Amino acid sequence: MILILRARWWEESEKNEDLEADDIRQVPGTPVRFSYEDLRVATHDFSETLGKGGSGSVFKGVLLDGTHVAVKKLDRLGQDMSSFLAEVEAIGSINHFNLVRLIGFCAEKSSGLLVFEYMNKGSLDKWIFKNDQGSCLDWQTRNKVVLGIAKGLVYLHEDCQKKIIHFDIKPLNILLDANFNAKICDFGLSELVDRDTSQVQTRTRGTCGYVAPECCKIPPGRITVKVDVYSFGIVLLEIVCARRNFDHTQPESENHLLRMVQKKAEQDRLIDIVENLDDQYMQSDREEIIRMIKIAAWCLQDDPERRPLMSAVVKVLEGVMEVESNLVYKFHHALITPAVNHHTSPQPQASVLSYPR
C-alpha cells in the first residue's frame, strides 16, 4: 500500500511539474521549453564544458536552427521545481541588450536545464587584467564595456516591472559578445523586489572584494539597489586600473586598490593609481581616466545614500551630467583585507538562474 501511494504521489508530482512548465510556455514572451533530448542532442551529449559552478555545469550547444547557446545543467533541483519555474518566468521576461538572454529551459523528471545566448569572447576578467590577454583592450573599448554594464544595471534597478538586485556584479559575471558589448549574467544570487519597496532584509551574499559595507554588518542591514552600485564601482576601478581590487602578489602598501585610491586622493594624485599609463592608454586619455576614477569613488561611498543611482552614472558617462564633487575618499571598508581567494561566492543562493559562475 505504501509503495502504491508513493508511486501515485510521484505521478501526481510529475504531472503538476509538467503543468506548471506548460503554463510558462503559454505566456507570450517567456522562454522556450525544450525537451531533455533536444538539449542532449544540441550539446552532443553535454560534451563541451564552458564552466562549472556551485549549482551546475555549463555546456556549449547548437540548436537545430544553428543558434549557438550555453546550456546550464543544474545539479540539484529536487523539490524546488515550482520556484525554479517561477524564476524562469520572472527572469526570462526581462529583455535588454546588456543582459545575457535566457532563451529557454527544460523541466523534466525533477531536472532543470537553462539555455542562454552564447557569448564567444567569454567573461570580462579574461580581458582587463595585466598579464592576461586583456591587456590588449584599448581605452575606447573599456569605456564601451563600462557604459554597457551601467545600462544593464539601470534596466534591472529602474526599468523592470520588479526591481532586480543582482548582488554579484564582478568581472566574472560580465560576458562579452563578438563586438565587446558587455552583458550581465548570473542571476544566481539576485532578488526580485516590488517597485514600491525600496529596501529588503537579506543575508550576506556576493563575492568578497565586491560586497558593499552594509552587507557585511552583523546582522546585515536593510539592502537597496545601492549594493550593486558599490560593486559596479569596484569593477570600474578594476577596468580602469587593469588590476584586481586585491592582489596578494603586490607589496602590502599596494595590494588593496581601495586603499591606493584613498592614499592618492589625499595626495591629489589619482592618476598615479594607473601603472604604466603611457603603455596602456594614450596621453590624451588622462583627464577621462581621472573622471572615471571619480565616478568609481562616487559609487563607493560608505554611506549608501551618498551613492548615485545607476541612471545618474549613465548620464555622467554619456557627458550630460557632472560627477558629484563633494566626495569622501575615506573608505572604511578598505581597512578590511579580503580573503586571498576573492572569487569565491558563498554557497547559499536565492536563485538557480546563473551562467556561468
Model-derived segments and spans:
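Membrane-proximal cytoplasmic juxtamembrane segment of single-pass receptors
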Residues: M1-V115, N120-K151, R195-Q201, T207-C208, ...
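Intrinsically disordered, low-complexity cytosolic regulatory tails
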Residues: V69, S111, P251-E252, I271-R357
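Protein kinase catalytic-loop region centered on the HRD/HxD motif
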Residues: K151-I164
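Pre-DFG segment of protein kinase catalytic domains
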Residues: I164, K183-D186
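Conserved catalytic-loop aspartate of Hanks-type protein kinases
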Residues: D228
